[in-house]
Design a protein with these regions (language model features):
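Conserved ABC ATPase "signature" region
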Residues: 81-88, 133-155, 207
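Hydrophobic anchor residue at the start of the ABC signature
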Residues: 174
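Catalytic Walker B motif of ABC-type/P-loop ATPase nucleotide-binding domains
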Residues: 185-188
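Helix N-cap at the start of a conserved alpha-helix in ABC-type nucleotide-binding domains
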Residues: 196-197
Length: 221
């Protein structure tokens, strides 16, 4: 499914059964510039939804609003509702860090930590209190398998993630997000910096992931 950010009509589903997240009259300002003009949109569970449109149409701004990544940009103001499990994510009293465990993000360019492959997966888990080595090992293996990377790295888990290819790094970033057990994955043009073969691998990975996750992706193509 795709949604053109130049189209303002409402796309709806039965919220009780199918909708993972929706926005109502979502507007985003950067200072005096209104970048998003009141978008109403619903995202179906276990579906890949693509936000498409030309550069500057607000795709990434909208996507980053869904888990409050725009909060860190000075002068940004977001109004309207972002509803996830009957809770407005845009409320100021929301625990943003806990929310981002449920609504994960993968960015345009691969951004692995300058740590080992293993530590890339476990870093956030440890910060949230997980210390059981066996459980961490299981999560690392499961996450890397879901991201179609396990077979390529299972013998090199303690080597630097920076030694991986661009496509492998992006799949590692997907695995890192999966490790937090999110319901929703947001991806901002995740293959734009990759070669065609790596792009195909990432796309195939996302198709397989939609069985367990709701995927919202920004793309030019």
């Amino acid at each position: 499914m795709s949604y053109d950010m130049n189209d303002r009509h409402l796309i709806t589903f039965d919220k009780d059964d199918k909708v993972a997240l929706y926005t109502e009259d979502l507007k985003v300002w950067y200072g005096q510039n209104e970048a998003i003009h009141g978008v109403d949109l619903e995202f179906e569970k276990n579906c890949i939804t693509a936000l498409i449109g030309p550069s500057g149409s607000g795709k990434s701004t909208y996507l980053r609003s869904l888990n409050r990544m725009n909060d860190g940009i000075s002068g940004t103001n977001v109004t309207g509702k972002i509803m996830y499990k009957d809770v407005d994510v845009n409320r100021k009293d929301i625990d943003v860090y806990e929310m981002r465990k449920r609504i994960g993000m993968v960015f345009q360019r691969p951004n692995p930590f300058s740590k080992s492959i293993y530590e890339n997966i476990t870093f956030a888990l440890k910060r949230h209190g997980e210390r059981d080595k066996q459980k961490l090992d299981e999560i690392v293996e499961s996450s890397l398998k879901q991201a179609a990377l396990w077979e390529q790295v299972k013998d090199n888990l303690h080597k630097s993630a920076l030694a991986l290819s661009g496509g492998q790094q992006q799949r590692l970033c997907i695995a890192r997000a999966i490790a937090m057990k999110p319901d929703i994955l947001l991806l901002d043009e995740p293959a734009s910096a990759l070669d065609p073969i790596s792009t195909g691998t990432v796309e195939e990975t996302l198709v397989n992931l939609k069985e367990n996750y709701t995927i919202i992706i920004v793309t030019h193509n």
